[in-house]
A protein has these predicted regions:
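Intrinsically disordered, low-complexity and often Lys/Arg-enriched segments
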Residues: 1-8, 12, 16
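Short, flexible active-site-proximal loops enriched in glycine and acidic residues
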Residues: 59, 142-149
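An internal, acidic/charged active-site-proximal segment
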Residues: 152-222
């Protein structure tokens, strides 16, 4: 059946990253990947519905939650990134952007902060709600498919939190470590001397859309 074929393909795919993990962790990797793809959702209750396990739903949710709480192991992350590297072109382009996850009705979420809600804000009006910042870095594969190489949810309310720039630098360093040389593409929100200096320090090429009030000095001439 189509379901069986899909499960086999996902199992083969996830084995590339979970080969060195324990048996329960390998099962979790396959279950969560299949469940999200089959349900089109990241809600654990929806994922459970697709797994059709004999255990009670709440027990399956608890099992998945425990594994998620552990995070992604270093070995699985390394195996994933090496696979992504094989999919990329010889001249990789890395896209970095910030987004937000809004939780307006949340009260018990850990380190819940205040973020600018991108879906409701405009160029003349900013709408702020409870939520988290998300920093994402991805590349285009040789088949022009976007694939993540860095993804982090963060909040200024976290203990020992430094700045959003610190997270962006981590994304840049991840790309630099993985590819050695790449072209970084970023929106006007990254029009910042700190970004230019960081990318220059690493010897990377970059394309950053400038803000309208940016003054550019080129060959001793100022361009506005």
């Amino acid at each position: 059946s189509n379901t069986y074929i899909l499960k086999r393909k996902i199992l083969t795919f996830t084995k590339k990253f979970s080969r060195k993990l324990s048996k329960p962790e390998r099962k979790f990797t396959a279950d969560i990947t299949y469940g999200m793809l089959a349900s089109g959702s990241c809600l654990l209750t929806d994922v459970c519905d697709q797994l059709h396990e004999p255990s009670q739903k709440i027990n399956v949710v608890d099992r998945l939650s425990r594994h998620l709480e552990k995070g992604v192991s270093a070995s699985a992350t390394s195996a994933y990134l090496q696979q992504v590297k094989k999919w990329s072109s010889s001249e990789p382009i890395i896209y970095i952007d910030d987004s937000d996850v809004v939780k307006p009705d949340g009260y018990k979420f850990e380190s819940l902060g205040i973020v600018r809600n991108g879906s409701e804000s405009t160029s003349t009006k900013s709408v702020y709600k409870k939520g988290y910042h998300v920093t994402e870095a991805c590349i285009l594969t040789s088949a022009n498919h976007p694939v993540s190489i860095f993804s982090k949810i963060h909040s200024s309310h976290e203990k020992d939190y430094k700045s959003a720039n610190t997270i962006t630098f981590q994304a840049i360093e991840q790309g630099n470590s993985l590819f050695g040389k790449a072209t970084f593409v970023m929106d006007r929100g990254y029009d910042d001397n700190k970004m230019f200096l960081k990318l220059d320090e690493l010897g990377q090429d970059y394309v950053i859309r400038l803000k309208s009030n940016r003054k550019l000095l080129y060959l001793s001439l100022i361009h506005i």
